[in-house]
Structure formats: structure tokens, C-alpha cells
Amino acid sequence: MIKTVQDLINERIAVGKVVNTHGLKGEVKFFPYTNSEEIVKNLSSVVLYNREKKVFYNLSVESVRRMNKLFLIKFETIDTVEAAEKIKGCEVFIKYEELPPLQNDEYYFYEILGCEVYYESGECVGKVVDIIETGSNDVLVVKKKNRETLIPMIKDCVVEIKKPEKKIVVKELEWI
């Protein structure tokens, strides 16, 4: 079966973006979409995709090292600044199964985005359209028509997260 670029992307998750070149030997500056250093440090075989140019590359990672808030990545076969320039702007994708396993009360943002949120009574609050990282806890941005509701991801508010059903049940609190 022939796979399209869209098929390749749908089977994977974006973990960051190549934002610039670094040096003359093909290293690139990588901006991670995740706060998990483990995911970035364990990159091996990746798909790079540039949405604007509609071009993709299957590459193997040679090395990864931290540089402030970014990482420097050296890909096999990318050995010059000119070659690195060609992948600038590409998002870096890995297969979902390459993500580290989580504890029961943990989640990846992609598992929560798009979930329908309901009160315990069954009333629909809306759909999760964004997640705000506050430092102490995440906050769901739930939208229904033109109304946005902010729901903190804390035990006092969230009753249950049903990841396979893309459903979250929350307590009906006065201030929500």
C-alpha cells in the first residue's frame, strides 16, 4: 500500500521544530514542543516535514545536546550548513509508540485536545481547544459556541479522564 505524506504525519506526533542552523557541519537548532527532555534525547529515526514547502525527509539522529532552551541535533547525511538550511522550518515527527509510557494520572496534550468536557450531570461544557501551562497545574480552555470556560486540571475539579473516548468529566463548581 502506498502511503501519502498525510498518512505518514497522521501516524506520528510532532515533538518540535528545526528553527535554525548551527555551525558549519550540519547541526541544527531544535525547538521542542515538549517539556520532556527524555523524548528529545531519545530521538532516533524521525520524519521531518515542512508544511509550507510540502516536503518531507526520513532521517536518523546522530546526536542530541542541550543548548539553553533549545537542543542541537545532528542528523546523519546532513553534513553541511547548506544541507541543514534545507530542513530549516521542518517539524520533527516521531511515532506515537515511541513516546515514553505515562503514569495513570498523566497525559500528553494531544490526548486531551479535542476532548468533549461534561459536568457530572451530563451537561456538555464544550470541547478542549487549548491547554495553558501555569506551572502549578494545567488549565483546560473549553469552548462551546462563543463561550470559553477555563477549568484547572486538579482533583477538586476533574472527576475522570476517559482518553479512549476523548471525554472528560468535571465537577460543576460555582466559579466555573
From Swiss-Prot:
**Primary location recorded for the protein, binned into one broad class:** cytoplasm
User: Which example biological process does GO assign this protein?
Assistant: ribosomal small subunit biogenesis
Positions the record marks as coiled coil are: none
Show the InterPro entries listed in the entry.
PRC-brl_dom (IPR027275), PRC_barrel-like_sf (IPR011033), RimM (IPR011961), RimM_N (IPR002676), RimM_N_sf (IPR036976), Transl_B-barrel_sf (IPR009000)
Q: Which Pfam families match?
A: PRC (PF05239), RimM (PF01782)
Quote the record's domain comment.
The PRC barrel domain binds ribosomal protein uS19.
Name of the featured protein:
Ribosome maturation factor RimM
Q: Which organism is it from?
A: Thermotoga neapolitana (strain ATCC 49049 / DSM 4359 / NBRC 107923 / NS-E)
Traced from the root, the source organism's taxonomic lineage reads: Bacteria, Thermotogati, Thermotogota, Thermotogae, Thermotogales
